[in-house]
Curated annotation (Swiss-Prot):
Major subcellular location class: cytoplasm
GO cellular component, one term: cytoplasm
Disulphide bond pairs: none
InterPro entries documented for this protein: METTL16/RlmF, rRNA_lsu_MeTfrase_F, SAM-dependent_MTases_sf
Gene: rlmF
Record organism: Shigella dysenteriae serotype 1 (strain Sd197)
Presence of the UniProt keyword Nucleus in the record: no
Protein name in the entry: Ribosomal RNA large subunit methyltransferase F
Function: Specifically methylates the adenine in position 1618 of 23S rRNA.
Family of the protein in this entry: Belongs to the methyltransferase superfamily. METTL16/RlmF family.
Length: 308
C-alpha cells in the first residue's frame, strides 16, 4: 500500500508517494537526479534545483497535461502538491454559494510568477479562466512562453503587467470585469537581508555550501517587499474595498499564524462582510489562507449565477 501524505485535500492528486518510475518515463531527465534515502528508498535530490525543476516538469506533464514547462534560473520553483491544495480549497470556498464548484469561474492570480503554477493547475482541474498579474517583465515573458507552448492555454489564461508601483488590484482589474476570486502567494520577507538570511538557513538545513543554488530560489519581488507579508496583505485589503462589487472572494496565503490578528483588524476596518480561514497541511508544513468578501450570502448566490 502506498504511504499517504498527511493533510492534503481529498481531491489532491498527490496523496501517494511519487511514482518515480512513471515520472522518469514522462521526463527522462529526472532519472539522473534520483538518489537513495538512508532507509534505502528511492527519492529525488531535493537539494538540487535542477532536480526539483525536473520533478515539476514531470508532475505537470503527468497530472496536469502541461507538456512544456520551464522557468529561468533563479526564479521560484514551487511545490506542485501544495499549490494544488490551495486550488482545491479555493474550489470548496467557491462551492459554498451554490453547492457546486463553478466550472467556468474567473480567477485573478496576483503575482502569477514565471512558473504560472496556479493557472496551470486550475485550468486542468476545474476548467477555470485565469488572469495573472505580474510586476516583473521577465517573469511575465516566462509565463507567456509556458502558455504559448501548450495548446489551449491561450484561451484560458491571460497575463497583465502591473505597471503601477505599489498597486495590487488598481490597474489590473478593469472597470466592467468581474471575478469569482483572487488568489495570492505574497512576498514573505520584509527586506532583502531577511530574504538572504532565510535562504542561508535553508542552505544549512540541506547541508549546502554558499555557492549552491536553492530550489526555493526566487527573485526579489517573489521573496520580499517593504514591510513583509502583513504589509502586503494589508495593502490588498485596503484596495479590495474599491472592487467590492467586482470580486466575490479575495484570498491570500498567510505563512504564519501570528500574522493573522493584524489582518483580521484590517478586515474589520474596511467592513468585510465575511472572513474565512482555510487551514492546509502538506506533510509537516502547515499553511493557511484567509478569504474575505463584501457580499452577503444572497449577493454571492446571485453573483455565482450571473452568467451561468
Amino acid at each position: 500500500m502506498s504511504a499517504q501524505k498527511p493533510g492534503l485535500h481529498p481531491r489532491n492528486r498527490h496523496h501517494s508517494r511519487y511514482d518515480l518510475a512513471t515520472l522518469c518515463q514522462v521526463n527522462p531527465e529526472l532519472r539522473q537526479f534520483l538518489t537513495l534515502t538512508p532507509a534505502g528508498e528511492q527519492s529525488v535530490d531535493f537539494a538540487n534545483p535542477l532536480a526539483v525543476k525536473a520533478l515539476n516538469k514531470a508532475l505537470l506533464a503527468h497530472f496536469y497535461a502541461v507538456a512544456n514547462w520551464d522557468i529561468p534560473d533563479g526564479f521560484l520553483c514551487p511545490p506542485v502538491p501544495g499549490r494544488a491544495d490551495h486550488i482545491h480549497h479555493l474550489a470548496d470556498l467557491l462551492a459554498e454559494a451554490s453547492g457546486t464548484i463553478p466550472a467556468n469561474a474567473s480567477i485573478l492570480d496576483i503575482g502569477v510568477g514565471a512558473n504560472c503554477i496556479y493557472p496551470l493547475i486550475g485550468v486542468h482541474e476545474y476548467g477555470w479562466r485565469f488572469t495573472g498579474s505580474e510586476t516583473s517583465s521577465q517573469a511575465l515573458s516566462s509565463a507567456q512562453a509556458i502558455i504559448s507552448a501548450n495548446p489551449g492555454l491561450n484561451r484560458a489564461i491571460r497575463l497583465r503587467r502591473q505597471k503601477e508601483s505599489g498597486a495590487i488590484f488598481n490597474g489590473i482589474i478593469h472597470k466592467n470585469e468581474q471575478y469569482d476570486a483572487t488568489l495570492c502567494n505574497p512576498p514573505f520577507h520584509d527586506s532583502a537581508a531577511a530574504a538572504r538570511a532565510g535562504s542561508e538557513r535553508k542552505r544549512r538545513n540541506l547541508g549546502l555550501n554558499k555557492d549552491d543554488a536553492l530550489n526555493f530560489g526566487g527573485q526579489q519581488q517573489e521573496l520580499w517587499c517593504e514591510g513583509g507579508e502583513v504589509t502586503f496583505i494589508k495593502k490588498m485589503i485596503e484596495e479590495s474595498k474599491g472592487f467590492a462589487k467586482q470580486m466575490m472572494w479575495f484570498t491570500s496565503l498567510v505563512s504564519r499564524g501570528e500574522n493573522l490578528p493584524p489582518l483580521y483588524r484590517a478586515l474589520t476596518d474596511v467592513g468585510a462582510v465575511k472572513v474565512v480561514k482555510k487551514e492546509m497541511a502538506q506533510g509537516q508544513k502547515q499553511s493557511r489562507f484567509i478569504a474575505w468578501t463584501f457580499m452577503n450570502d444572497e449577493q454571492r448566490r446571485r453573483f455565482v449565477n450571473r452568467q451561468r
